[in-house]
């Protein structure tokens, strides 16, 4: 949901008071992750989410397994992580595995997974999307809004 043409995301229009939500967050790139988590928490509060559990995992590669484990116990999952391109193919492998894994969790379980995994060429790109002061986007908020909105659409 990035860039020109993105839908407006205002979680105050949602009533998630009956939803159980898991937020799964990676630990790398602390400043960016703090912004993503703050954004997700704001969206959950704006939508009055009923029950929220937060889990931290080491990195973005671990997001799918944690999301999979939690998906059976909640109505929506918000997955947050940051991968910044380095000088090796590791970036491509982690991004592909995490993206495919989170998609698989959502399709296999029927539990919406809000996709808040930033795949950035530079740390500055991540900071610009983290919902921090001066950021142009708030991907944590957007990911939480997407998970809640989809869960409500599906009748959770």
UniProtKB/Swiss-Prot annotation:
Active-site residue list: 90 (proton donor)
EC number, as in UniProt: 2.5.1.78
Residues that bind 5-amino-6-(D-ribitylamino)uracil: 28, 60-62, 82-84, 115
Keyword Metal-binding: no
Enzyme class: transferase
Keyword tags: Riboflavin biosynthesis, Transferase
Pathway(s) where this gene product acts: Cofactor biosynthesis; riboflavin biosynthesis; riboflavin from 2-hydroxy-3-oxobutyl phosphate and 5-amino-6-(D-ribitylamino)uracil: step 1/2
Ranges in a coiled coil: none
Catalytic activity: (2S)-2-hydroxy-3-oxobutyl phosphate + 5-amino-6-(D-ribitylamino)uracil = 6,7-dimethyl-8-(1-D-ribityl)lumazine + phosphate + 2 H2O + H(+)
GO molecular function: 6,7-dimethyl-8-ribityllumazine synthase activity
UniProt GO BP: riboflavin biosynthetic process
One Pfam match: DMRL_synthase
Binding site for (2S)-2-hydroxy-3-oxobutyl phosphate: 87-88, 129
GO cellular component, one term: cytosol
Recorded family membership: Belongs to the DMRL synthase family.
Physiological role: Catalyzes the formation of 6,7-dimethyl-8-ribityllumazine by condensation of 5-amino-6-(D-ribitylamino)uracil with 3,4-dihydroxy-2-butanone 4-phosphate. This is the penultimate step in the biosynthesis of riboflavin.
Record-given protein name: 6,7-dimethyl-8-ribityllumazine synthase
Organism: Kocuria rhizophila (strain ATCC 9341 / DSM 348 / NBRC 103217 / DC2201)
Gene name of the encoded protein: ribH
């Amino acid at each position: 949901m990035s860039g020109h043409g993105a839908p407006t995301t205002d979680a105050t229009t949602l009533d998630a008071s009956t939803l159980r939500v898991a937020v799964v967050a990676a630990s790398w790139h602390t400043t960016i992750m703090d912004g993503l988590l703050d954004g997700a928490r704001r969206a959950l509060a704006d939508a009055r989410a009923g029950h929220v559990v937060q889990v931290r995992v080491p990195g973005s590669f671990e997001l799918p397994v944690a999301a999979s484990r939690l998906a059976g116990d909640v109505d929506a999952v918000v997955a947050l992580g940051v991968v910044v391109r380095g000088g090796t193919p590791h970036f491509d492998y982690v991004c592909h595995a995490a993206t495919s894994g989170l998609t698989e969790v959502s399709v296999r379980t029927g539990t919406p997974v809000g996709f808040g995994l930033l795949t950035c060429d530079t740390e500055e790109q991540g900071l610009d999307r983290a919902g921090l002061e001066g950021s142009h986007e708030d991907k944590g908020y957007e990911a939480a809004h997407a998970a809640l909105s989809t869960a409500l659409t599906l009748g959770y």
